[in-house]
UniProtKB/Swiss-Prot annotation:
Role this protein plays: Catalyzes the conversion of dethiobiotin (DTB) to biotin by the insertion of a sulfur atom into dethiobiotin via a radical-based mechanism.
Source organism of the structure: Vesicomyosocius okutanii subsp. Calyptogena okutanii (strain HA)
Family the UniProt entry places it in: Belongs to the radical SAM superfamily. Biotin synthase family.
Taxonomy of the source species: Bacteria, Pseudomonadati, Pseudomonadota, Gammaproteobacteria, Candidatus Pseudothioglobaceae
List of residues binding [4Fe-4S] cluster: 54, 58, 61
Quaternary organization: Homodimer.
Name this protein carries in UniProt: Biotin synthase
Amino acid sequence: MTQQRHNWTLKEVEALFTLPFNDLLFQAHSIHRKNFDPNQVQISSLLNIKTGACPEDCLYCSQSSKYDTGLEREKLMEIDLVLKQAKQAQDNGATRFCMGAAWRNPTDKSINKVIPMIQGVKDMGMETCVTLGMLTQKQAFVLKEVGLDYYNHNIDTSKENYSNIVTTRNFQDRLNTLESVQNANIRVCSGGILGLGEDQTDRASMLRSLSNLAIHPDSVPLNLLVPIPGTPFENIEPPTESEFIRTIAVARIMMPKSVVRLSAGRTKMGDTMQALCFFAGANSIFYGEQLLTTDNPNTDSDQDLFVRLGINQKQANNLQSV
């Protein structure tokens, strides 16, 4: 099953989730191997270029202005510092540099301040990605014109669970921005977070929403929630390791040609869990000790992991084999 489908039913997706674990991983790995080199992983790096004071009320987020998490508000980074961080990421093996700003929806003035950052990173020979919040169609076209490669806009969870995690926007708002980005021919990076109080049906529904987009996301980041003290979700029950690995596997089956990225939460994953995620179809990670406001394994730790697992870093453009 390597054909890209956009008509998955919820019943079909739930059936995948309930397969015996070994059967599910075998099916996912077989599809992964047909579309990618199973021993290659793409490396991205993520930088928070504007921290905190977000007006949204996402119950899990340290950057929301609604909660006292001890996070200090920081204004937009100067371009020289951004490019210095990008060069360091490139020297460490990253092929894509992602820049995130804690905005609900950026103003045109804010977009204009980010444009030189995008152009500077592109001039270094890296792929560019930004996550800036909800976009208008006009803003998406502007970002395309300046050469942006990827736009990240996660749907977070299922449509059914969405109002339980945020009230300042709705699920359709997320889809509208993804549509604007795809209309501008910018490649989409969109995934979700596990550990938001969702059940297996919610995970199935979330993946169904992603796979039934007009074009599958080029990248599907899947995050394991890192509970933040001071947020309403600071004591929420995390998913089990097998639940997370199952979600990776189902994502690979449903979106066979998308890059599936292990994102936040890897500090809680040992070698075995990460190895099973790679076997199930994950083929990208975020590199560097910080992901926005949460910790991430250091580069030496990841390099050691790659050596132990026999994994090679590859340029993003050379990752896909079919």
